[in-house]
Amino acid sequence: MVLNVYCCFFQISDIQTMKINQTILKEFILVGFSVYPHVQTFLFVVFFCLYLLTLAGNLIIMGLTWVDRSLHTPMYLFLSALSFSETCYTLTIVPKMLEDLLAKDRSISVTGCSLQMCFFLGLGGTNCIILTLMGYDRFLAICNPLRYPLLMTNIVCGQLVASACTAGFFISLTETALIFRDSFCRPNLVKHFFCHMLAVIRLSCIDSNHTEFIITLISVSGLLGTLLLIILTDVFIISTVLRIPSAEGKQKAFTTCASHLTVVIIHFGFASIVYLKPEASGDDTLIAVPYTVITPFLSPIIFSLRNKDMKNAFRRMMGNTVALKK
């Protein structure tokens, strides 16, 4: 009898504890860089400068493409779409991160967290697909130059970009719904500087291994699928370029593809580290910095530095600005 009462008492205690832990959470706390308190001010200055330069670079590319009619071609429309997507991608993550570097309150509502995650995944997926479409555009231009104007018009380009956004956000909505269908338990500490899906999944009240496996499978499949398509188009491009008789033609073709390949290597290289690294190795917060801050910063620089059309358009714009002032 005494033993039964004793067992009942502890069962009730366990149930009460479980109910407390499974209380519906209204907010998460982003741990972020609070584990590095001595360098937070330095990190704020560095990330803020990179943030401004990223916005400036992408806005210049979008502005030039919009203003200069010579850039109203599929190649630059894809580049402008990528710049717009990366600008939104940066705005989704960096402002909140900068705020948390200076603030003591690092909370984010559950709704805000789900929206941030959805936009982060959707825009990240859109970037991958647009990079793939840019490779396909170069493939058509180099391997099928006579049919290129018929196959890739500005209207087709717009339709492909819209499809990329739709596909990217369809996947992101699916992943976000899978994650937020479960309830979350305390402690509500997200060990990241934004609502990264793997960091949030681990706060689930139930065993999240199955959900984590599905999310990882979807993300890795998306990354590898788009990367394989890019590699395939590049193989055809290289084989075609090597058959071009003139050295000038080869150089022009390689220059056109070099910027795209560089961005692809950086983008997919940094993103793949998140899913291919061993679970217990390294700090997820530091590993996320390259693909959330550095990649969007480097992309406009790489695409603009060796691009003569962009340079000429920029000079014309600056010349027109100076002429108007006079």
Swiss-Prot record:
The keyword Membrane applies. It is found in: Cell membrane. SUPFAM superfamilies: Family A G protein-coupled receptor-like (SSF81321). Residues 63-70, 137-155, 234-253, 306-326 are cytoplasmic. It is a multi-pass membrane protein. The keyword Isomerase does not apply. GO terms for cellular component: plasma membrane. It holds the Pfam family 7tm_4. Keywords: Cell membrane, Disulfide bond, G-protein coupled receptor, Glycoprotein, Membrane, Olfaction, Receptor, Sensory transduction, Transducer, Transmembrane, Transmembrane helix. Residues 1-41, 92-115, 177-213, 275-284 are extracellular. Disulfide bonds join C113-C205. GO terms for molecular function: G protein-coupled receptor activity; olfactory receptor activity. InterPro entries: GPCR_Rhodpsn (IPR000276), GPCR_Rhodpsn_7TM (IPR017452), Olfact_rcpt (IPR000725). Its main location: membrane. The chain crosses the membrane at residues 42-62, 71-91, 116-136, 156-176, 214-233, 254-274, 285-305. Glycans are attached at N21, N209. Belongs to the G-protein coupled receptor 1 family. Odorant receptor. This is Olfactory receptor 10X1. It comes from Homo sapiens (Human).
